[in-house]
Amino acid sequence: MRDLSNHANSLVSYQKELSLLMEKHTDGDGIHETLIPSLSLIRSSKTTFPSFSVHEPELCIVTQGSKVVMLADESFTYGPSSYLVISLDLPVSAQIIEASPDVPYLCFRLKLNLKDALDLVNEANPVSRKKLRSKRGLFVEQSTAPLLDAAVRLTRLLDNPEDIPILAPLIVREILYRVLQGEQGDVLRQMALRGSSSNRIAVVVEQLKREYMEPLRIDELAAAAHMAPSSLHRHFKEVTAMSPLQYQKQLRLQEARRLLLSESADAADVAFRVGYESPSQFSREYARLFGLPPISDITRLREQLGRVP
């Protein structure tokens, strides 16, 4: 019982220190890049509407407030007692659901390098490189004292910028090791292992991102993954929670929304630019994902952002 109590006290202590460091190095709400290239700090004094984007591999540790992330129809909620890992590029929606001016949402976000993960896998266990079945490429796990300790030490380097070039890579490597050693570390491990089904799905995802405007050719994607088409569908859905076609639609629709918001472009023109042949089909699928047809959605977005067309 004493060990459990000490562990809980350590977690709370590290969370408080990390919160203080993030408050110190964030000037108001928003995403704050730091002198450590892979590290950004996020702060919000209010809850938010859902935002849609493609998230690259990353670790997110929240010390105050909470957030919900949607991957297809699956929901993942995390806050001060847990952390989130995304192991490959995934189109998700994210919403801060707990935040206030007195207790703002605070998040430590670290980009993950799968090559570094592979190096650690090889060093930690160079003999056993067993390729397991595909697993979902996003997970939430309980925070640990060693992980938070490393996050605190990395953030503390912002007070001593001259130490960053030497010490930051070592601590980032330690953080990655802690994630790999976690209960769901196999997700990241399998994604890093060349030739594993998860790694081959990551290759397909990269191809879909490059060619999202082109017609979907399952045979070509299957060949790139060295899988049969039926096997590709199964593994792709296990990792991303969606089919290749659904993934492509998410990419197209998110890019369309970005273009409509940033360029005040015509909806039909944007539909063709992102690969749709039918503006009416584009409008239907847009409304299904974002809740409103294109023009109504962009009007709502501008109101939320306080922007004038």
Language model segments and positions:
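A short, N-terminal "cap"/entry segment at the start of jelly-roll beta-barrel domains
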Residues: M1-L35, L39-I42, T48-F49, K131-K135, ...
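Amphipathic alpha-helical segments enriched in hydrophobic/aromatic residues interleaved with Lys/Arg
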Residues: R2-E17, A117-E174, R178, D186, ...
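N-terminal regulatory/effector-sensing and dimerization cores
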Residues: I31-S128
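A ubiquitous short alpha-helical element
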Residues: P50, S134-Q142, A192, E220
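Charged, amphipathic alpha-helical coiled-coil/dimerization segments
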Residues: P126-V127, E238, R252, L261
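N-terminal positioning helix adjacent to the helix-turn-helix/winged-helix DNA-binding module
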Residues: P146, I171, L193-V204, T240, ...
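Basic, amphipathic alpha-helical hairpins
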Residues: R153-I164, V179-L188, V203-L216, F236, ...
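Basic/polar phosphate-binding segments, predominantly the helix-turn-helix DNA-binding elements
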Residues: E174, R178-Q184, L193, K209, ...
